[in-house]
């Protein structure tokens, strides 16, 4: 469902943000 896709994209964005936060700098 489109709603499910939105959650998947949101999860990817958050996951990438966490990865950058802990592995960046």
Curated annotation (Swiss-Prot):
Q: Which residues bind Ca(2+)?
A: 9
Cystine connections: none
Cofactor(s) needed, names only, are: Zn(2+)
Q: Which keywords appear in this protein's UniProt record, sorted alphabetically?
A: Calcium, Fibrinogenolytic toxin, Hemostasis impairing toxin, Hydrolase, Metal-binding, Protease, Secreted, Toxin, Zinc
Which organs or tissues contain this protein? Expressed by the venom gland.
Chain ranges passing through the membrane: none
Regulation affecting activity = Inhibited by EDTA, beta-mercaptoethanol, but not by PMSF, p-tosyl-L-phenylalanine chloromethyl ketone, p-tosyl-L-lysine chloromethyl ketone, soybean trypsin inhibitor and aprotinin.
GO process terms (BP)? proteolysis
User: Where is the protein situated, by its record's location annotation?
Assistant: Secreted
- Note on how the cofactor is bound: Binds 1 zinc ion per subunit.
> What GO MF terms are annotated?
metal ion binding; peptidase activity; toxin activity
Task: Give the UniProt entry's GO cellular component terms.
Answer: extracellular region
EC number from the UniProt entry: 3.4.21.-
Q: What else is known?
A: Acidic protein of about 24 kDa.
Q: How does it assemble?
A: Monomer.
Q: Which family does it belong to?
A: Belongs to the venom metalloproteinase (M12B) family.
The task this protein performs is described as: Metalloprotease that is highly active against alpha-(FGA) and beta-chains (FGB) of fibrinogen molecules.
Name this polypeptide is given: Snake venom metalloproteinase catroxase
- Please name the source species: Crotalus atrox (Western diamondback rattlesnake)
